[in-house]
Swiss-Prot record:
Pfam families reported for this sequence: Amino_oxidase
KW Flavoprotein (keyword) present: yes
This protein's record includes keyword Metal-binding: no
Broad class of enzyme this protein falls into: oxidoreductase
Gene that encodes the chain: cpaO
Catalytic activity, reaction form: beta-cyclopiazonate + A = alpha-cyclopiazonate + AH2
Protein name: Beta-cyclopiazonate dehydrogenase
Regions crossing the membrane: none
Organism annotation: Aspergillus oryzae
Effect of a null allele: Impairs the production of cyclopiazonic acid, but accumulates its biosynthetic intermediates cyclo-acetoacetyl-L-tryptophan and beta-cyclopiazonic acid.
Source organism phylogeny: Eukaryota, Fungi, Dikarya, Ascomycota, Pezizomycotina
Superkingdom of origin organism: Eukaryota
């Protein structure tokens, strides 16, 4: 009905809805680019666009920029990163940090030794027999995947016909290339049941650039990951609309219009020449978007895992121990979902990071209950004097490892996905479009910004 009335009045649907919602000219913001999402990719894009002389408006649902890059500060102001803990030490990273005048240094984990524990039994075990440690495993793995050089920048530049090895089950790829002794090390850098994954997605978690970064070392802001986004927020100022969500979007060949609602219920009409979408393109995230048939078809194909990052205090665990989960009953020691990936200590006494992964039904309540059960089991078995901890932060990193079937990839899914760039003045970036590591996302975002500039 709104569309028919808008056409009759000679208005865009969004402009009509703006009138219907009582939005007047004083509640309208005009910018060159409207950015949906102020996480790693959206914030980077905003700074780069500003440097190119463009005006921007960043729409972010949280009350902070940075997405998964969160930092908790203790009473003595010690920064504890959870979620994103560092960046690849590359020119892209260094230029960005220096551009925002954020002091940085090498990322050194807190001193600790690793205890291998089967978290299904609560008992100590050993590193999976016959499995290589990280450095040796990565060298063997990189040699096997060097044939897929088109993935070396983290973007899904997949040739057609698609190499069958690339879309084979990872377990089959392991056997074909005799990688059985490298599986556990690779699992520790993925998210999900690695034995059930398609090889492509394992590479996008621990490919050539990732292995190089692990060998060369990461960097991180000295005052915490959040310091980067605080600096960006200060520079962007009122161009960032925090605690704000899009309600209606209209896209044309010559511009876009977006109605957004802030936390206090205020509605604003944003008008832009281009739209940059950095949020995960799931159908449930795109309410209010009049999607094309191709967009709807592609975005309906996604599957993903649930990933939770917990920062806890007072667990009863020793301060100098990291717990690595090894399932001695499964092939290569790789746990089955849901599982606790690992428990890592922090630079502040008493604090630990706990990373939990599960399927689509592994919600926040289920994840917390699972975490408590595992800690109780460690206590019951006498492995550690654990008890129910204080949850300082419990952050959702869902969706993680967004993937589609081998049949979809073989049929040109990623080619069709990238063909969406620029249609109806809309561009896309973020973890769906490249490997989910900030440095690689920034590199791909630069490519998208070049496309926007030339369109």
């Amino acid at each position: 009905m709104a569309v028919r009335i808008a056409r009759f009045l000679g208005l865009s649907t969004v402009a009509y809805l703006a009138l219907a919602n009582g939005i007047d000219a004083r509640d309208t913001i005009s910018r060159d680019v409207i950015i949906l999402g102020g996480g790693s990719s959206g914030t980077y894009a905003a700074i780069r666009l500003r440097d190119q002389g463009k005006t921007v408006a960043v729409v972010e649902r949280n009350n902070y920029l940075g997405g998964h890059g969160e930092t908790y500060y203790t009473e003595d102001n010690t920064p504890l990163n959870f979620g994103v803990e560092g960046f690849f030490n590359t020119t892209v990273t260094r230029n960005y940090l220096e551009r925002l005048q954020v002091p940085y240094g090498r990322r050194d984990p807190a001193p600790a030794h690793e205890d291998y524990v089967n978290l299904n039994t609560g008992q100590r075990t050993e590193y999976t027999p016959g499995q290589l440690q990280d450095r040796e495993a990565f060298a063997k793995w990189v040699d096997a995947i060097s044939q897929f050089g088109f993935l070396d920048d983290g973007v899904y530049r997949i040739p057609e016909p698609v190499p069958e090895d690339l879309i084979s089950p990872f377990a089959d790829f392991v056997k074909k290339y005799h990688l059985e002794d490298a599986v556990y090390a690779l699992f520790s850098h993925t998210s999900g049941d690695v034995l059930e994954m398609i090889t492509l997605y394992v590479i996008q978690y621990i490919g050539v650039p990732h292995a190089a970064a692990l060998n060369e070392g990461y960097v991180r802001p000295i005052e915490g990951i959040a310091a980067l986004y605080k600096s960006a927020g200060k520079e962007l100022g009122s161009d960032v609309l925090l605690e704000t969500t899009p309600e209606a979007v209209q896209r044309f060949e010559d511009g876009v219009e977006v109605i957004v609602r802030s936390a206090d219920g205020t509605k604003t009409l944003l008008k832009g020449k281009q739209l940059l979408v950095t949020i995960p393109p799931l159908l449930e995230n795109l309410h209010g978007f009049p999607l094309s048939d191709q967009e709807s078809r592609l975005f309906s194909k996604w599957q993903y895992h649930q990933y939770w990052a917990a920062l806890v205090n007072d667990t009863g665990l020793p301060d100098d121990v990291n717990i690595v989960n090894v399932d001695t009953e499964r092939l290569y020691g790789v746990p089955e979902e849901p599982f606790i990936w690992r428990l890592d200590n922090h630079w502040a006494p008493g604090y630990h990071n706990i990373k939990l992964v599960g399927g689509s039904e592994f919600g926040e309540d289920e994840a917390k209950a699972y975490m408590y059960e595992r800690l109780d089991l460690l206590h019951a078995e006498g492995t550690y004097a654990t008890h129910k901890p204080e949850i300082v932060k419990f952050a959702s990193h869902t969706p993680v490892t967004m993937f589609v079937s081998a049949e979809e990839i073989r049929g040109g899914f990623y080619r069709q996905l990238y063909e969406l760039q620029g249609l109806n003045s809309t561009f896309w970036t973020g973890a769906t479009w490249a490997s989910d590591y900030s440095t690689l996302l920034w590199g791909y975002t630069d490519e998208v910004l070049d496309q926007m500039a030339s369109s």
